[in-house]
Amino acid sequence: MTLTQAYILLAIAIAGEIISTGTLKATDGFTKWIPSLICILAIAICMYTMSHAMKILPIGITYATWSGVGIIALSLIGIFKYKQIPNLATTIGLVLIVIGVVIVNTMNDA
């Protein structure tokens, strides 16, 4: 597997995490079958692809990227879908997450 392939798998894992967590609210405590099934399948795909990405990428880089991009994406879903407007401290924190993800990936020797 190449480094590019590992990052593609990581991107799929991130998409799975975003779909899974994004549908979690719609599951209504896993009482609604369709959103629950989507949530479970998405997280299974996420974990499977992330485990393969970790064959090449260091665990710290993989997890930092996965969680950082997921946090940003889900925060944007919260803003646009649920009208959850972040305050200044939250916005600063989100900007720092983006900076951190960029730094760990550009300074990575993998």
Regions found by a protein language model. Name each.
Residues M1-A110:
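Polytopic alpha-helical membrane proteins, predominantly small-molecule transporters/carriers
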